[in-house]
């Protein structure tokens, strides 16, 4: 796919190879270390949540916030070509296959799942680093999926990306001032004689010494490099930020600092986040609403309390069972581990029907024949499972313990079940296959 180099320049940083990453040693000058030693946090015997909550509370959901970004039936198929002189398309990698979600204005949506499920591809589709195979991405009346590169250029300033690896996402041959100031020059946001002052202002916003604008990336630690990446993403005052696992490459103490910084930025600039991560503890702290992906599909989406206390999809339950929970331990309980059998199927040839059925202990014949719809079973809760009509009461004893229902204060919620909420959000199927009656039923 051919893209306008000027359009891409402000969104995608220069990618450098492994050698460049090795040259960016994790060293910090004595001056910078002394100036910002107050940012360092001891993490002995602490987890992410306890560190993050020292100065920041978990983000809250605003149910009345309008959507700034609406994604509908988004698809991304990468062609697989044969070898030889005549290269033919012999298949497609279905990286993203028909997902739908909304990102609220000034809010955040978490996107979680195993490696290879399509999370990062989704983020690159939102920023139009990839052009979608199908579907729509509505942003302020514009369908980003249908725009040409030329039409996208003025909108790129509104949708920016924070990349995962702070060591390879910064060009080691450019100074911090050049890296952060590049988007300003591409879009001519400010006169050239004001670029430096704007760069220094942004460095101060992200907690770096503004006088270090003339230093190179290898003179900063990993956490500070990620702050540089955040400053670059903020340069154009975006309305949507796609954070692609922004803290996965950092130490846990630095993770908490960076996530708290992102919260401060969200509160100060009213920017919306699509927060991509595989660390469920971080997502729980930052995102009041979470979507769970598996093999290119969204299998469950809901608010924080519902997803973490009363997950309905077997895959979500398995993910959460693998997360150490200090709140469970605080009330004397434990969460039994759900171990998934087998490997994740190939996205080139995914299973028929439900894509999770090959690893699901509750799979039935209907799961192989019919793909489950994303069913709305609560006001802000949707599940893609044929047995969602039983509201979590699967046809076998639940693998997770009763203490899985724990509120945000760590108190157990006995017999936690979804609330009997009226279906208020249109656009989702309201029927499912009931295992007990062996027929399709409705809400």
Where are these regions (language model features)?
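Short catalytic/signature loops enriched in Gly
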Residues: 36, 44-67, 79-87, 92, ...
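Helix-to-loop junction immediately C-terminal to a conserved catalytic motif
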Residues: 127
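P-loop NTP-binding/switch modules centered on Walker-like glycine-rich loops
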Residues: 239-242, 246-332
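Conserved ABC ATPase "signature" region
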Residues: 142-143, 194-211, 320-321
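Conserved ABC ATPase signature
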Residues: 216-220, 224
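Conserved ABC transporter NBD signature motif
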Residues: 135-143, 155
């Amino acid at each position: 796919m051919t893209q306008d180099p000027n359009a891409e320049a402000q969104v995608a940083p220069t990618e450098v190879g492994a050698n460049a990453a090795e040259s960016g040693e994790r060293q910090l000058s004595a001056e910078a270390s002394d100036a910002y030693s107050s940012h360092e946090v001891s993490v002995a015997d602490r987890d992410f949540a306890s560190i993050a909550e020292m100065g920041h509370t978990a983000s809250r959901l605003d149910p009345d916030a309008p959507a700034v970004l609406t994604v509908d039936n988004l698809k991304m198929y990468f062609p697989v070509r044969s070898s030889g002189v005549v290269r033919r398309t012999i298949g497609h990698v279905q990286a993203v296959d028909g997902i739908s979600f909304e990102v609220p204005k000034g809010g955040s949506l978490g996107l979680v799942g195993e490696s290879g499920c399509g999370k990062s591809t989704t983020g690159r589709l939102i920023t139009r680093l990839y052009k979608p195979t199908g579907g729509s991405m509505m942003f302020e009346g514009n369908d980003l999926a249908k725009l040409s590169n030329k039409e996208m250029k003025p909108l790129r300033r509104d949708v920016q990306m924070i990349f995962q690896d702070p060591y390879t996402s910064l060009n080691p041959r450019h100074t911090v001032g050049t890296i952060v100031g590049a988007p300003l020059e591409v879009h001519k946001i400010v006169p050239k004689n004001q670029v430096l002052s704007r760069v220094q202002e942004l460095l101060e916003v992200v907690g770096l010494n503004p006088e270090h604008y003339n230093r190179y990336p290898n003179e900063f630690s990993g956490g500070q490099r990620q702050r540089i990446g955040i400053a670059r993403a903020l340069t154009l005052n975006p309305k949507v930020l796609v954070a692609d696992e922004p803290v996965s490459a950092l130490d846990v103490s630095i993770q908490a600092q960076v996530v708290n910084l992102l919260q401060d930025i969200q509160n100060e600039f009213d920017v919306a986040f699509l927060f991509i991560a595989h660390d469920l503890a971080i997502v729980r702290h930052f995102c009041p609403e979470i979507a769970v992906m598996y093999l290119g599909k969204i299998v469950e989406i809901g608010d924080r309390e519902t997803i973490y206390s009363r997950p309905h999809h077997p895959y979500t339950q398995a993910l959460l069972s693998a997360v150490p929970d200090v709140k469970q331990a605080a009330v004397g309980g434990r969460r039994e581990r759900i171990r998934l059998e087998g490997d994740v199927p190939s996205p080139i040839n995914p299973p028929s029907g439900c894509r999770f059925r090959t690893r699901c202990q509750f799979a039935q014949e209907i799961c192989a024949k019919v793909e489950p719809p994303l069913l709305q079973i609560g006001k802000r809760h949707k599940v893609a499972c044929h047995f969602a009509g039983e509201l979590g009461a699967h046809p076998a004893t639940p693998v997770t313990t009763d203490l899985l229902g724990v509120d945000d204060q760590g108190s157990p919620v006995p017999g936690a079940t979804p609330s009997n909420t009226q279906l208020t959000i249109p656009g989702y199927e309201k029927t499912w296959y009931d295992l007990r009656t062996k027929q399709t039923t409705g809400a």
